[in-house]
Amino acid sequence: MFPWGLSCLSVLGAAGTALLCAGLLLSLAQHLWTLRWMLSRDRASTLPLPKGSMGWPFFGETLHWLVQGSRFHSSRRERYGTVFKTHLLGRPVIRVSGAENVRTILLGEHRLVRSQWPQSAHILLGSHTLLGAVGEPHRRRRKVLARVFSRAALERYVPRLQGALRHEVRSWCAAGGPVSVYDASKALTFRMAARILLGLRLDEAQCATLARTFEQLVENLFSLPLDVPFSGLRKGIRARDQLHRHLEGAISEKLHEDKAAEPGDALDLIIHSARELGHEPSMQELKESAVELLFAAFFTTASASTSLVLLLLQHPAAIAKIREELVAQGLGRACGCAPGAAGGSEGPPPDCGCEPDLSLAALGRLRYVDCVVKEVLRLLPPVSGGYRTALRTFELDGYQIPKGWSVMYSIRDTHETAAVYRSPPEGFDPERFGAAREDSRGASSRFHYIPFGGGARSCLGQELAQAVLQLLAVELVRTARWELATPAFPAMQTVPIVHPVDGLRLFFHPLTPSVAGNGLCL
């Protein structure tokens, strides 16, 4: 018995020694890893690196970030301040929030920082896109795309967008069961982008097939840049090539159309604008531009649309105020055509043919609707931030940002900490954007509200996105009422795009026109 006891003690002692050695090695490795990044500071600058942790060797804090989501950034902001360092996805990162700090980053494009996209995104989207362009090519392409989102172009888009949104809301009411709003919004935004922006002639089956192919491309956009069988990049390349093959036929038709004809959609405008600048766009350029437009409109607009539906459901007082404003503007009456019978097997009813009653001018008069849309984008911005790479070492808030390091500016954190609004930033308060509080915001509020970024890379399609959300709000409020199909509101996932974890499952019910004809009743 005694020898057996000694044997057990020996095993335990050996195990303890092994664990102690492993712990010491891990501690030493972490210390050396931290030292390695401390020594990477620019010694020509007397400023220190920002506070923060570089995590574990090679992995950095990536695992913490993936598990904690938005809490990862907020906890470190509380601990280290509005500028801190970390290590994510294999790169050293400086996380930045706060209006003044973000202003420095956004206005420093081409001078202090440049846009940063993963290599896989460059491979899949191509070399002729605005996202990957820098310097003069970026300015030239931005000038061409600016016409796609000009006021004249938006005037042409709005009636067709309203028709698509009206049809969609009526189909939700006719569904006869719960609707996954996020999934439905993704399908809707793809259809609108493909048919209205790009002018593609697609039936429902073709649109659904192309949407699935496009979603496969987007899902693999941020993958390891390894083109090997079964890799994410290989799947993305296959999806991209399928999209390009489909687009090629439609683009060929446009290239051979009458050059003097008035452009009718975004692809027409891109072709005409390039020709006016003395450049004949190639087929490859146009295919990549078309995919980029789809990418820009897809997830972000679907995310914002879902957030709009969610926040209105949580705040019925806002619905009542929107309804009052619509009645005051003579827009309270919805399309009087009854949607298809609930639960019918025929699917969504055909378009009723009612004339669109909204224009950019009419939307401009809906001040409270505009405030609601802005508040949705402030509280739940679709994208949490943007990435840049430091072109040279520069100062930010008393710290050095070393050349070559990644810089991530945070949209969400900046909105959450903005002090220019009278009401608490965590609450839903559309009135914060009303005229009554305009003086309290002042000119300094420009970089406190940045759902579309800012500077040289601000979103060109922001007015179109806001118009889509305004149109959706109007059609929802005067057409339907909606309620949860689940016991409680879903949690929100924030990485990579803000969306409810369950897709937001809701029941939609049609409203009936009031007898008076100037309002709506249940």
From Swiss-Prot:
Membrane spanning stretches: 9-29
Protein name: Cytochrome P450 26C1
Induction trigger: By retinoic acid.
Tissue: Detected in most tissues at very low level.
Residue sites binding heme per the record: C459
PROSITE patterns named in the record: CYTOCHROME_P450
A cellular component term, taken from the record's GO annotations: endoplasmic reticulum membrane
Pfam families, alphabetized: p450
Connected disease: Focal facial dermal dysplasia 4: A form of focal facial dermal dysplasia, a group of developmental defects characterized by bitemporal or preauricular skin lesions resembling aplasia cutis congenita. Skin defects occur at the sites of facial fusion during embryogenesis, with temporal lesions situated at the junction between the frontonasal and maxillary facial prominences, and preauricular lesions at the meeting point of the maxillary and mandibular prominences.
A biological process from GO: organelle fusion
Recorded topology in the membrane: Single-pass membrane protein
Keyword list, A-Z: Disease variant, Ectodermal dysplasia, Heme, Iron, Lipid metabolism, Membrane, Metal-binding, Monooxygenase, Oxidoreductase, Transmembrane, Transmembrane helix
Molecular-function GO term, any one: heme binding
Catalyzed reaction equations: an organic molecule + reduced [NADPH--hemoprotein reductase] + O2 = an alcohol + oxidized [NADPH--hemoprotein reductase] + H2O + H(+); all-trans-retinoate + reduced [NADPH--hemoprotein reductase] + O2 = all-trans-4-hydroxyretinoate + oxidized [NADPH--hemoprotein reductase] + H2O + H(+); all-trans-4-hydroxyretinoate + reduced [NADPH--hemoprotein reductase] + O2 = all-trans-4-oxoretinoate + oxidized [NADPH--hemoprotein reductase] + 2 H2O + H(+); 9-cis-retinoate + reduced [NADPH--hemoprotein reductase] + O2 = 9-cis-4-hydroxyretinoate + oxidized [NADPH--hemoprotein reductase] + H2O + H(+)
UniProt cross-references to InterPro entries, sorted A to Z: Cyt_P450, Cyt_P450_CS, Cyt_P450_E_grp-IV, Cyt_P450_sf
Cofactors, names only: heme
Gene name per UniProt: CYP26C1
